[in-house]
Amino acid sequence: MESRKTFDSIPDDLFVEIALRLSSKSIARCRCVSKLWASILYRQDFTELFITKSSARPRLLFAVLKASGLIFYSSPQSQNPSLEVDFHNHMKFHEDMNLYMCSYVSGFDPIGKQHKVLCMNKRLNKEWVHYILTLGTENLKWRKMICPLTHEPYYGRALSINGVLYYFARTSCFLVVSFNVRSEKFKFLDGKDFSNFHREFINYKGKLGVTKLECDAGDGHPRELCVWVLEDVEKQEWSQYIYSLPKIKVNRIRNDNIFAMFLPLTI
């Protein structure tokens, strides 16, 4: 009993300082030591401090898809990277998923201070279903969602801005999907102007921006850059800017997933 009393009598500020130096896996283990430790390590202020500290020593995260779920591995990101990786977590799919094809996007709720993962998967019967996972909770569990419009996530990088997650999708037409991470509600914006492969989302001063690169039909060189900025989500009002690009010599590498241009160092 005396050892237990000494064990739990560590001052909170000292305990937090020590815990901030641990790995996330060690933090999870410490939460099981005692109710007192769990109450401290589950606090929102500790989570924010831990994320801030961890971001100063970033790690690369790898996910391997297996029949039973996703297996995560991580490796320190340093100037002299090692090929060694650590086993991080094994997360099973929801038993109802019955996967044929799946896509994952993540977003952050700045009010609730929560990271969430949105999973969209195509089942064997060709039906698209949606699941949501809230990270940092005691019981990591996928929750099935009801989406008002069946849609297929489309080629392109998702972007999270001020608690709203944006990604491209298509039904019978091309869409920009807006997903509120906190309320978990969908909105669908007309995306017909962006329906080609040369476009990306950008964060334009806290607003959603979409860039679209137009290329010459003859030689394939970039001709102009179009930038749309979403001014009003409810009214679907966009402002548009068009920049004409000078015709310069470029070398391009392109395949189904990569499009890169090598430009002169001085312009």
Curated annotation (Swiss-Prot):
InterPro entries on file: F-box-assoc_dom_typ3, F-box-assoc_interact_dom, F-box-like_dom_sf, F-box_dom
**Occurrences of domain F-box (ranges):** 4-53
User: What domain of life does the UniProt record list for this protein's source?
Assistant: Eukaryota
Pfam families, per this entry?
Answer: F-box (PF00646), FBA_3 (PF08268)
Check the record and name the Gene3D superfamilies matching this protein. Answer: 1.20.1280.50
- State what protein this is by name: Putative F-box protein At5g38810
Species name? Arabidopsis thaliana
Lineage of origin: Eukaryota, Viridiplantae, Streptophyta, Embryophyta, Tracheophyta
